[in-house]
């Protein structure tokens, strides 16, 4: 969120959907040093609820959608999260994006089948392996699926 806010214009808006109210409380607590300053930014709206509901209500509204749900596309720990990584969920994200929008999916692992699903749903996809944070050395990497919405019948 902090990185998004750094790049966002003053008249921009960010909607954060968080299913677990305790996560919002933790992030609002300045003593924990997690993100209270970000959540207090007037450009940020917090929705305590399911991201699916935000996406359904936002058809064509978003320039970008960032999904960091569970462990990603296949290493799921919570039932029901898989719906975001199936055709219906990817279609929902696609419809929520405005022209030229981009969706970023965080995952613990690379998933070629998910890339195929995204491409078949009207996205051009780039896969990036990134470190958990800027100062991380060695160890694990995360995977970002960057899905650029393309107009029907065209490719970037």
Task: Please report, for each region that a protein language model flagged, where it lies by residue.
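Active-site beta-loop-alpha junctions enriched in small/polar residues
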Residues: 108-110
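Class I (Rossmann-like) S-adenosyl-L-methionine-dependent methyltransferase catalytic domain
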Residues: 112-115, 156
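The AdoMet/dcAdoMet-binding core of the Class I SAM-like
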Residues: 1-97, 105-106, 116, 121, ...
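C-terminal lobe and adjacent flexible extensions of AdoMet/dcAdoMet transferase-like proteins
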Residues: 145-156
